[in-house]
A protein has these predicted regions:
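A structural signal for multi-pass alpha-helical bundles of membrane permease subunits
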Residues: 14-300
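Short, Lys/Arg-rich, polar N-terminal cytosolic tail immediately upstream
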Residues: 1-13
Length: 300
């Protein structure tokens, strides 16, 4: 209504109009996120299996997990994965982002090349690396031709080497993804800061540590949090490189791999798998909150 009392011609909005537009997205979140999570929590307190329902067993599944050596092996592998992979995915993409920002002929090709693994299927990436790392694969063939080894390096047949190989695949696939994050952050660094430092005699290395790193530190914390969550959820790399057993004796299994194995394997222990899933969720939540706290502390 105008000041003169006339009708503006604009449609009349009621209080529920915004909620009407939010409803489709809200329904999707409830259907595909909240409901599965609630159902997982409920099932974790039962002895349910794939082909039958289960009765309430209280905290038995959680007690079993905490007393299960396989659970602790998988937890140790997941935490080790995080400790190794996260620093690599925080530092290496930053170095790449700085390099591809340079005005070098043909640098556009390298930008695309670094990002290519991101858009490739995780299964395809795993199969490529399986061919590269197997006993008669590319790496071992080169090593033998150069007389660096007499026997093939057991990249895929030793649990420790398998875990390291999977870490390499994860880092390789994540480099281009997190490089884009850093490119966005570097674009917000004022060029005048580098120019002033150069005039004062600061070299490229000093400018990097004195200007670039402090300016992109919030992004480094974000990348650290995201890569930590991703590292705790790793499954495909272990499955493709190590097979359904998770390497020799299951020694390279991570928590997501263990969840799949007990929940969808021959025993089909859905209730126990859900309990392990909740424990993985809590572990992920701890690292997420830690990353959030560090980010807030940096902003303060």
């Amino acid at each position: 209504v105008t000041a003169g009392g006339g009708d503006t011609g604009l449609p009349h909005r009621t209080w529920w109009t915004p909620y009407l537009f939010l409803a489709p997205g809200l329904v999707m979140v409830l259907l595909f996120s909240l409901w599965p999570f609630v159902n997982t929590v409920v099932l974790s307190f039962t002895d349910a299996r794939i082909l039958r329902g289960g009765g309430y067993v209280g905290l038995d599944n959680y007690r079993r997990a905490l007393a299960d050596p396989d659970f602790w092996v998988a937890t140790g592998n997941s935490v080790l994965y995080l400790v190794v992979v996260v620093p690599c995915l925080v530092l290496l993409p930053l170095a790449l982002a700085v390099l591809v920002q340079a005005e070098i002929p043909g640098i556009g090709f390298f930008r695309s090349a670094f990002y290519t693994p991101v858009i490739a299927s995780a299964v395809v990436v795993g199969l490529i690396w399986q061919w590269v790392l197997r006993s008669d694969g590319l790496v071992n063939t080169v090593f033998r031709r150069l007389h660096l080894v007499s026997e093939p390096v057991p990249f895929l047949t030793d649990s420790t080497m398998l875990l390291v190989s999977a870490m390499i695949v994860t880092v390789w696939k994540g480099l281009g993804y997190y490089m884009v994050f850093y490119l966005a952050a570097l674009g917000n660094v004022p060029a005048s800061l580098h120019e002033a430092a150069a005039i004062d005699g600061a070299g490229p290395v000093r400018r990097f540590f004195s200007i670039t790193v402090p300016q992109v530190k919030p992004m480094m914390l974000l990348v650290g949090t995201l890569s930590a969550i991703s590292a705790l959820r790793v499954f495909t790399e272990i499955y493709i490189l190590g097979g359904e057993g998770g390497g020799p004796g299951g020694g390279a299994r991570t928590l997501p791999f263990l969840i799949r194995q007990v929940g969808l394997g021959f025993s089909g222990e859905t209730g126990y798998a859900c309990a392990v899933s909740i424990l993985l969720f809590l572990l992920t939540l701890v690292f997420s909150l830690l990353g959030r706290r560090l980010t807030k502390g940096d902003e303060a």
